[in-house]
Regions:
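Phosphate-group recognition and catalysis centered on beta-loop-alpha active-site segments
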Residues: 21-247
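Bacterial Sec-dependent N-terminal signal peptides
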Residues: 1-23
Length: 247
């Protein structure tokens, strides 16, 4: 290989590495948590689209952020009663199956948050149901799992296929503790990272990745990009994409 070709190859390799290392955008609540909004998040090129899952009284898995919607508690209502509810955009509250079906038509990663439930038994049941459905639908390679529940995180790590990214949201565990538990990284609130900025380097030194949520202020976006966090979860993915172009 002559010198010119070697220089071109080196430049391409450096560019590829820079692209790979750039902070990636995750749309909070799927831009906003319906099959239609998932497609929107995909259309603007987000790395991932985050959505929240509950297990209903009859074990049906449904997608919704809050524990109660239109006076119907997610955990204590039947699934059909929940999926019959209309959302503000006119879509019905989706089942997990409906949401994942829409996900088949996307390229974006599916970032599933299992909400903390009333007891560990229900969380384990939810983890088992989620993993079975994801496998049936052929989406195992597209999924990442996040949760505030330490028990649910451990269950995802125990039961999901080896190498599946699982992250913890609650914020009290250090990168070293997360590594020991088998987590892929930390997924912490902006306030936690501001309090412990050293955790970014500690996590990277341990081979873990760092996601920060929910970041909507431009100055916070800039600071996190400068700190080289791996992912930023935001309600303003278009604004974040514009900021990333400046780096």
């Amino acid at each position: 290989m002559n010198l010119k070709k070697m220089m071109m190859a080196s430049a391409l390799l450096m560019a590829a590495c820079c692209m790979q290392a750039q902070t990636k955008v995750i749309a909070h609540r799927g831009f906003w948590k319906t099959p239609g909004s998932l497609l929107k998040a995909d259309s603007i090129g987000c790395y991932g689209s985050e959505f929240d899952v509950w297990i209903a009284k009859d074990n049906k898995l449904v997608v919704n952020h809050d524990p109660v919607y239109k006076m119907r508690p997610m955990e204590y209502s039947k699934g059909d009663a929940l999926t019959g509810l209309k959302l503000s955009n006119g879509e019905n509250l989706p089942s997990l199956e409906q949401y994942l079906e829409a996900g088949k038509n996307c390229n974006t990663r599916l970032i599933l948050e299992l909400k903390a439930h009333s007891n560990k038994k229900r969380e384990t049941k939810a983890v088992q149901g989620i993993l079975a459905m994801v496998k049936k639908m052929g989406l195992e390679n597209r999924m990442e799992y996040i949760t505030f529940s330490l028990h649910a995180m451990k269950e995802f790590i125990r039961l999901a296929p080896a190498g599946t990214p699982v992250y913890y949201l609650n914020g009290e565990l250090s990168p070293k503790e997360l590594k020991e538990l088998g987590a892929a990284g930390l997924d912490y609130h902006m306030g936690v990272i501001k309090k412990h900025p050293e955790w970014i380097k500690e996590a990277h030194d341990l081979g873990l990745t760092v996601n920060v949520w929910t970041v909507d202020e431009v100055e916070d976006m800039k600071w996190l990009i400068e700190q080289k966090v791996d992912f930023i979860t935001t309600n303003e993915p278009v604004i974040l994409q514009e900021e990333l172009k400046k780096f």
